Amino acid sequence: MALRVSRYFFTVIFFIMNILHTSDWHIGKRLMDRERLPEQIAALDEIVRICETRDVDLVLVAGDVFDTFMPSADAEEVFFRAVKRMAGQRRAVVLISGNHDDGVRLAASAPLAAEEGIYLFGSGRDVMPMGGARGVHAVASGEGYVVIGNERGEQVYINALPYPNEARLKEEKTEESYTDKLRRYIARGEAGFSGGMPHLLLSHLFVAGGSVSESERDIDLGGARAVPPALFDGFDYVALGHLHKPQKFGERVRYSGSLLQYSFDEQAKKQVVLLHTDGTDISCEEIPLTAGKRLVRLEEEDAERAAELLRQYEGAFVELTLRLKAPLTSSETQMLRAANEGLVSLIVRTQGAEGLPVVRRSTLSDKELFREYYRSVYGEDPADDLVTAFLELLEEEA
């Protein structure tokens, strides 16, 4: 706050710091065999424009910037160009790794990135470089936290907790629950907080009760890694990544959602969250993102009617489920493909000899495939901890 004094009256001016929350870019992610990098570039350009037109001071990126541990050179180029433009000449970017990112690889360029106002946390033990002549920059840092200040003297405290998988928590006591381990990690990131500024947590977690989409691995769905919203008591705002559907727990614990629609059940519009703080209070504004193709899920019982329906969704990616009494012919398949070049998934369900539906196994999730295989070999369902172990191994190989 600034106090302007004149000869006749006092004028109190409140300065507002604007903070943009985004996550789950998944740069390099494809849909089936379709390249989506041009869509991702367009959506990132849209975020840059929001930063410029809405006077954003600080950008928070809550993990999963890449889709794999070893992103392509093209994906890395898109990432670095985007965050450099978001930082511009006067903004700062604070970014953490997610479960799809290699935290060590992501943070390798942290010293150079900090010179551009970009602060990369690959683990909860990282410490950011401080100082610089930029208008918005790090003024203090320690293990797992950074304080960002601007030229007006306003500051915001960010407790940064990248995706805490079991490998990253292996030094913690094994008898503790996952939630208790996280509580201690969060407490470590509070070491530099003494009040007097907005108090934020930036993390990549699965909150109990969250709505999951098909584009996310179901590794957290057994509940072992679901954390209660009460874990975040005491923070003014919690900027989360991991779940692709925008959602919130109260007003100040939010998932911004993914950059694009990455699965056919993600029908909610994509967005970023813009925070406005005067140093004592925070308000939230949801700003829609319009870049990227729609993902549409359709069903029909007749191939010709399905072709007519497909023509209505030109420019979208489509998953079509056909429920037929007889197998689909090759000519019908060609007709459907010609009706919409965005048809990326064609699921045909026909009646079996006994009138039962025949479901293609390619429609099953990793968890369902594992359970089906286990039942076929051992004649019983696998234990939940065995399923979790399998999915953890699958994640490590991804």
Specify the residue positions occupied by each region the protein language model found.
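N-terminal active-site segment of His-dependent metallophosphoesterases
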Residues: 6-90, 201, 392-398
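Divalent metal-coordination and catalytic microenvironments
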Residues: 24, 44, 59, 64, ...
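Accessory, non-catalytic peripheral segments of nucleic-acid enzymes
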Residues: 58, 276-398
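His/Asp/Glu-rich metal-coordinating catalytic cores
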Residues: 71, 94, 101-239, 243-247
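Short, electropositive alpha-helical surface patch
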Residues: 74-87, 110-121, 213-226, 251-269
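Short, conserved loop/helix-junction motifs that constitute active-site signature segments
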Residues: 88, 194-195, 230-234, 310-313, ...
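Binuclear metal-dependent phosphoesterase catalytic core
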Residues: 131-154, 253-317
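Contiguous mid-protein beta-loop-alpha structural module that forms a pocket-lining wall or clamp
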Residues: 199-201, 229-278
